[in-house]
Amino acid sequence: MGPNPGPKAQPAPIRGFGVKIDQYTNDVDLKDEANVKLWEAIGDHISLVTKFLAGGGPTDYGAGGKPLLFCGAEAGVHQPWDTSIVKDHEGKNVVTDRDPKTKMPTKYLNLGLAFMGVSRNPNANAFWMSKFDGYDLDYDDDTSLCAENPKDGRLRYAKVAKRPFIRYTKMRLPPLATAIPLAVVWASLASVINANKAANALLASISVSTVSGTAPGRPTELVSAQEAILAGDYTKRLHYQGRDVCPVGCSNAGIDTSSWFVYGSLNRLDRACDRPMLLDFALANPIDTQKSHVAISACTADYENFSSFVPSSDSATSCASKVAEQAEVTFPLLLKSSGASSSQHVADVTSALEQLQAFAILSNSGCNETIKYFYSGDVIVGVYAGSGLAGQGVLSTVLEKLSTRIKDDGSVAESWSVEMCSNSSARYSLSVLVNTKGKFGAVQRGLQASKNGTCFSTETEIAASDWETVTYLAASASSITSTANPNKLTSYRATACRTIQVVSGDSCASLATQCGITAAQFTKYNSDPSLCSGLTPGKHVCCSPGTLPDFTPKPSADGYCYSNLVKSGDSCASLAAANDLTNAKIESFNKMTWGWNGCEKPFAKYKICLSTGYPPMPATIPNAVCGPQVNDTVKAPPETDLSTLNECPLNACCNIWGQCGTTGDFCTPSNSSTGAPGTAAPGKNGCISNCGTNIVTSSAPGKTYNVSYHDLGGRPPRPPFGEYNSKDSRIPANFSCERVVQLAMEMGHSTIVQLLIDAGADTSLPHPL
């Protein structure tokens, strides 16, 4: 967008979306004092805002810039709470979960802090807008920053936008503080406009200590106070954006599951979200074992119009062997079912198949095996496709066929499976497993069988001839002769042979076919007489003359170990075979590796060492809010205590999943069998920093205040005075200002907390917010 070309026709306002801020700022009062404060507060973030606005904008986003924004109507007043939304000038949604250019996760601008110069007014509150997960700042008594200046009718700016996480090593202001007009704190800092500086200055000035008995100016029953706070379980709402909402949408997160949110168990995932999701986790780590730790990567299944997705036309060719001749293979699909059939889950199952089909199409250009799950209530669908089928669209085709079958039948059995598993090698295995009884472990074990090159059994089978076939390209043995040239590809060096890796179900015959050589040549190049009877998945074998290369990883020049990001199909055995190691060596390399749970229960998308050396910085967890796995954490020097990075605000506890809280789920340290940092005992979430639940206090304050708060839950804000059906909880009158701030932040994001300076007023009555 260039400079304003002059007067032009203004588009008609879109009904139901509040007022439009003019894209050329013609109707925005740049002299309005409130606008000046807004720009001062968030001017440094404004260039980030425009990345989420369709149509872009000018490159210079200083004061007087030209944002393309529709502003939602005042929360719950002029417009229904659940329909407020942000639109661009063409009426399209512009708020997303990910920067469209960098693909980095983002969070919303903290209006409660950025607008503190305005929201110091006790009638100004930042309200959560559930439809687009953003905020509207209610201004004064009768209007909104989304509306107009009541003095002259000209429009005000309202920035409902996002910014990336900004992390600090020691102290960070939490997103949950957004909804808290900190009137008590800011009353003593009225001259300070920049809220972030003011907050940091206040928090830095607090000297805290732990006490076990009474202290002057403090409640006499500290144990009772502690129990009362913990019993409230306020931390279930702490860091609401990171822990108590559904994971990032799949359409925004992309196919790299490293960008998906991570949860420590199915139970935790169930508490966080009730929407359909796609999941990824280590196949070797049982998900239904009681008290088992499983790092589950999840995204909200939200693909739309996936039928328009176009896979790469040369994917099949690019993934095929470059030496073995390829031939078309037509293979039957075995359809199996068990349990009673019902129409109850038809819509959920077909939706699951469509979401997995969309993912399969988008990831079609990859050349690796596919292991993914759909999860929604009792409906679980798992898919496996071997690496030999990668890039050929076979999985997408099978998912579409099964979806059509279920729609035509109008019913679905308790358990269904579609399998292509009579091949000798898992390289060409495929399975789609459906369960409508919530039996996740059964689906996981079925996919494990497919990866092992075997079939998953159910009670009742429909013969393969009664259903469908699929066609794909595979290495052909029929074209191989004794004169085949085994050196079609350049080898590592003159003396090194060309290699391929074993997969489950392989035999020396199938490996020879993949190599494009005869069985006799394969035996000649691989002289170990015990090789064919002990093929281990991951192991390298020779496809040409020469010496088998040394695949043992080496430490880096700066002393760090050779790190490997664990994939969902990896196991210690396969990693050891692929890297000329043993399970015992892998265990020894990772004694100090963050999140290392041992070979029995590896975490997918976690980094591990495959050599000696310093352990690597752990892989990031997109929804982590504390600890070393927070996004954009700077690499720490060797032997740094990683648990000290990105500590929780106000000394709250941080658990091994990078979440903050003040209950036993966050504050109780425990040891795993490995003793590695960032791990915990089975069934526990552990604690990595600020552990324990002792009350933390400062010295007696010079002045104390009485405060009250009101839990509005999920209801719209600002009901008429006297109509609160809420809990009027009293904080002890002698709590210091700092302690009140701590409690307010602990109470969390879904609670609108107002701290009132009580100069003798009756605090037994609810205060209007």
Curated annotation (Swiss-Prot):
It is a single-pass membrane protein. Gene3D superfamilies: Endochitinase-like, LysM domain. PROSITE patterns: LYSM. Disruption phenotype: Show no significant difference in the expansion rate of lesion diameters in apples fruits. Its main location: membrane. The chain crosses the membrane at residues 173-193. SMART domains: LysM (SM00257). SUPFAM superfamilies: LysM domain, Plant lectins/antimicrobial peptides. Glycans are attached at N305, N368, N423, N452, N631, N671, N706, N734. InterPro entries: Endochitinase-like_sf, LysM12-like, LysM_dom, LysM_dom_sf. It is found in: Membrane. Belongs to the secreted LysM effector family. Non-secreted LysM effector that might be involved in manipulation of host defenses for successful infection. The LysM (lysin motif) domains are small globular domains involved in binding chitin in eukaryotes. LysM1 contains one LysM domain. In plants, chitin acts as a microbe-associated molecular pattern (MAMP) that is recognized by lysin motif (LysM)-containing plant cell surface-localized pattern recognition receptors (PRRs) that activate a plethora of downstream immune responses. This is Non-secreted LysM effector LysM17. The gene is LysM17.
